């Protein structure tokens, strides 16, 4: 399968995934800690909602408190209760149940992430014949959506 060109990026369904867990050895409850009156996860979600290339942004969690916050604030979420050691593991589990061509794993503790940087990452990745991009976010995709030479096995 050929990589998609910049002209076909908009014909792809691209979903932003924000893994958010309560338990942490360094900072328990970090997603709901307030930053100038707003929880961190809300700030991350709001920034990601400004990314033009994303069709939807979904918070991934295994915690009742984070789920409740998302429900109360109309933030799309998916409950991923599997034993996931990392946010990337949580994303890998989630993409099994979400219909899309491409997924962007956006770190849940980047409340001031630049939406333009995520757009740049997506357009650069889909518009170039490159095997990897390192950025504040990591592009993930379903195996049938991209050339096998670029597939990331999780």
Q: What residue ranges belong to the model's regions?
A:
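N-terminal glycine-rich phosphate-binding loop and ensuing alpha1 helix
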Residues: 3, 11-61
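Short beta-strand segments
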Residues: 19, 105-107, 139
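Short, high-confidence coil segments that cap the C-terminus of an alpha-helix
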Residues: 54, 100, 130-133
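Short phosphate-binding loop-to-helix
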Residues: 58, 64-123
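Conserved donor-nucleotide/metal-binding helix-loop-beta segment in metal-dependent transferases, i.e.
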Residues: 116-139
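Conserved small/polar residues in nucleotide/adenosyl-binding loops
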Residues: 141-148
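Hydrophobic alpha-helical segments, chiefly the membrane-spanning helices
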Residues: 153-154
């Amino acid at each position: 399968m050929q990589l998609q060109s910049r002209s076909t990026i908009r014909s792809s369904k691209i979903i932003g995934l924000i893994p958010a867990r309560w338990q942490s050895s360094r900072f328990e409850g970090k997603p709901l800690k307030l930053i100038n009156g707003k929880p961190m996860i809300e700030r991350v979600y709001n920034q990601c909602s400004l990314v033009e290339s994303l069709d939807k942004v979904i918070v991934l969690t295994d915690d009742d408190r984070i789920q409740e916050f998302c429900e109360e604030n109309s933030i799309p979420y998916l409950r991923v209760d599997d034993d996931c050691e990392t946010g990337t593991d949580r994303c890998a589990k989630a993409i099994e149940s979400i219909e899309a061509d491409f997924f962007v794993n956006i770190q849940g503790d980047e409340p001031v992430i630049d939406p333009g940087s995520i757009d740049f990452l997506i357009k650069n990745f889909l518009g170039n014949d490159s095997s990897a991009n390192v950025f504040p976010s990591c592009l993930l995709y379903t195996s049938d959506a991209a050339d096998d030479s670029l597939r990331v096995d999780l």
